[in-house]
């Protein structure tokens, strides 16, 4: 295990506790609200202003027409090392990565385009580090596909070459689609991703096929009051077209949204492990921890 992995595993508990204490700092106001839900914004609400439930759900919505700046650190200190069906020992994946994601919305009369760039810097168990396959994605949402409380969209996805020690040094291409909806304190949806080329060598062993596994990410968030929420996190299930096998993680996310006049901050901690992986011929994380901060800002 790399020095970074050992250090991350040793400090994860303290960092998680510090984050949860920080999130709890703003909960005193929520106590006064009682059964009335989250406290009202500091500034007087204008007529027709969105409710606190809607404002929180919007901060969680990656398909909303708003600027988004995300920074995240994910630590994967240990993996399952059982014997796979092909007789080989299950390999480890990356030990940790830093992620930066930016969304820059383009609003037109008949549609909205959400260009999104995701950069990740990985480190593996051998101590090797470098940039992963940067993703450039453009979600296209026609106005007719937006029904107010939710929307659906689809768009092209391109992956750039990464450092060969931690990623594939080649281009990839594909598409992604999303469908989301909010109802009161609930926010839920489904994301799909399908790419070709640039197959992650730690996810599945390289084969003659250029087809990556299909990514399916259902998500569900519920508001707890006072800006707090709980959800299942980035639970990306994968289906391998070649072996017909499925990998399914499971996790829990606890976060808090701070709604401000010009935008919102979303801070969360997430834990994840592997639920279905026995027939999967790739890595399967045993314990994964993510610390995230995101700032969203409506256009205009």
Label for each model-derived stretch:
Residues 32-300:
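Transmembrane beta-barrel domains of Gram-negative outer membranes and organellar outer membranes
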Residues 1-11:
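N-terminal secretory signal peptides that target proteins for export/translocation
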């Amino acid at each position: 295990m790399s020095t970074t992995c050992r250090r991350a595993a040793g400090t994860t508990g303290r960092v998680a506790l510090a984050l949860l204490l920080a999130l709890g700092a703003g909960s005193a106001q929520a106590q006064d609200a009682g059964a009335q839900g989250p406290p009202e914004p500091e500034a007087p609400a204008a007529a027709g202003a969105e409710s606190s439930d809607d404002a929180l759900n919007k901060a969680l919505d990656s398909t909303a027409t708003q600027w988004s700046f995300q920074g995240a650190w994910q630590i994967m200190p240990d993996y399952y090392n059982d014997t796979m069906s092909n007789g080989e020992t299950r390999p480890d994946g990356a030990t940790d990565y830093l992620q930066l994601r930016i969304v820059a919305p383009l609003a037109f009369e008949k549609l909205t385009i959400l260009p999104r760039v995701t950069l990740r810097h990985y480190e593996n168990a051998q101590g090797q580090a470098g940039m992963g396959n940067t993703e450039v994605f453009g979600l296209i949402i026609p106005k007719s596909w937006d029904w107010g409380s939710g929307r659906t969209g689809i768009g092209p996805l391109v992956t750039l070459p990464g450092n060969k020690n931690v990623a594939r040094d080649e281009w990839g291409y594909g598409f992604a689609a999303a469908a989301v909806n909010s109802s009161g304190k609930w926010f839920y949806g489904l994301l799909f991703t399908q790419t070709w080329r640039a197959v992650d060598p730690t996810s599945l062993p390289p084969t003659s096929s250029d087809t990556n596994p299909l990514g399916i990410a259902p998500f569900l968030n519920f508001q707890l009051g006072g800006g707090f929420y709980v959800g299942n996190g980035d639970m990306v299930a994968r289906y391998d077209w070649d072996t017909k096998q499925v990998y399914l993680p499971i996790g829990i996310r606890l976060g808090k949204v701070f709604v401000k006049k010009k935008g919102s901050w979303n801070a969360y901690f997430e834990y994840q492990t592997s639920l279905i992986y026995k027939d999967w011929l790739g890595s399967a994380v045993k314990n994964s921890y993510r610390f995230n901060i995101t700032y969203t800002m409506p256009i205009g």
